[in-house]
Structures are given as structure tokens and as C-alpha cells.
Amino acid sequence: MNQRPSMPTQTAPARKSISQSSQPLSSSTPVPAAGDGYSGIKEKSGSLHSIIEHVMTYTFPLLCAVNLYFAARELSWVSLAVVIILGVPIAWILADFVSGLIHWFADTYGADDTPLFGPWLIKPFRQHHLYARDICTHNLVLTIGNSCTGAAPLQVGLLYFLLSDDDVSITNAALAFVFNLFTMAMVATNVLHKWAHAEKTNWLVSRLQRSRVFLSPAHHHLHHTPPFDSNYCITNGWLNPLLERIRFFRNMEATLSAIGIKPNESSYAAVSLSRNLAPAKTDLREG
């Protein structure tokens, strides 16, 4: 295992509530105490939310496998090889872009109490700036449950598309295969994000982070520097330099502001402690 330097974040009071229900630490709770990027709170989904997360976490990969099969059976071996060679990087890049859009939206618009999106999307992202390593205490369901819940309906729609057409064209089969890879990459994004904050990872993950196949801690640190308004893409971060260079998100904000949709500065500034903190110290190992 590769030992990483500690990654303390900005000082903040221990939170009293989180997007899921929380409970105090006990001697048997394997969650680090407050400090060094941790809130000291064990996160646990509410009962109904937890049921949905568990069902979707285990349903999603089954749907992926079924859809990959039905898409692949319409392709020759040569076509399938071409689709995989071209489709994997396309899906990986597209997932990085969409992860950036979602992250930017959650950081910039709405509030903790925004219907539907507030509790399960906006609040967790913003609290993550204060307690960056809390994500490392999440089990698989807490890590990808919400992502699977959002992606599973897309897989159901894809399955209907593949089964409702008696003669799926090669083009449609190839697009379906790549779309499947894209949803898989989107679900994997929060795992890659979690690894970018982890104190320890195995040698393979560390190697893939250093080679920038996965999101690296050093690169992700750029987002965790106040005012937390850049480098939003968190699948691998490949698109961040380009999007920052063309001021993509600032231009998006200007466009939306022109039609009356303005960033929620008061809510976001409160979470980033008025954007006046010194940059958070994080893991700056090579990567």
C-alpha cells in the first residue's frame, strides 16, 4: 500500500447535519475523528433512501451487462473491437465533461433545501469542500448509490431501445455500446473521486492516478483551493485545462445570468467560508 501524506482541509466546526442522516461516533464505528479533512460524523442514508440505493447499486451492473450483450451481439468481432478501441476513450472523456457540468451546477446554483437536488446533490458537494475526506469513509452503496439511481433508468431506456427494434443497425448498436460505457464511467466517477482523497490506495490505483488515467490527488487539489470555482471535472480531469482556458463555466454563468438565472453566491460563499480562507493543504504527491 502507498502511504500518502495527511490532507488537512480548512478548519471548520463539526457539522450537525448532512445530506443523509448522521449519528455520533462510537468506539465501534470505523470513522476517523473530526479533523484532518474528516467531520467525525458517520453518514448513513435514511431507510427509504437506503433501500433505493441498495437496489439500484446492484441492479445497475446487471442492466449494464445485459445491454452490453444485446448491443455486442449485433456487431461483428471486427466492429466490436473498433467500437471498444474508439468507444472507451470517448466514454471516458464524455463522462469527465458531464461530471464537470454536474459538479459545477451543484457548487454554483440552488441551495441545500432545493427540492430533490438539494439534499442528495447540492449539499454533499458543498460540504465536501469542508470535509474532503468524509467521502473516504463511505461504503460502496454510499459512494455510488445516488449515481446508480440516476443511471439505472437510462439503462432501462437503453434496454427498451435494443429490444423493441427487431433489426438494430450496426450504427445504433455501436452507439448503444458506447452509451453503456459512458454510464458505467459516470457511476465510477465518484469512486475515482474518493480515491483522489484517500490516504492510502493500492499500487495499481496510484499508478493510474500518476499516469492521469484516473483523477489524481495533485490535480484535484486545484479544485479544493478557495474559491473552489475551477477544475470541476472529476472522472479523470482531462478536460479541466481546456475548459479553464476557454472559461467555459464562467461563460455559462454569464449566459444564464443574462436570462435571469444567477449563481447562488450567498449559499456557496457560506460553504466556502466567504472565499477568504487560505488554500486547503492537500496531498500534493506526484500525479
Predicted regions and their residues:
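Cytosolic/stromal cytosol-facing helical appendages immediately following the last transmembrane segment
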Residues: M1-S50, A81, Y109, D113-L116, ...
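The first (N-terminal) embedded transmembrane alpha-helix
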Residues: H49-F70
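Core segments of transmembrane alpha-helices
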Residues: T57-C64, V141-L162
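Alpha-helical membrane-inserting segments
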Residues: A65-L68, L94, V98, I102, ...
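Membrane-interface helix-loop junction between the first two transmembrane segments
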Residues: A71-V82, L101-D112
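Membrane-embedded alpha-helical segments that form the functional core of polytopic membrane enzymes
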Residues: W77-V98, N172-A188, S206-R210
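Extended non-transmembrane interhelical loops and adjacent amphipathic helices
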Residues: P119-R126
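Membrane-proximal helix-loop-helix units in multi-pass membrane proteins
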Residues: P153-V178
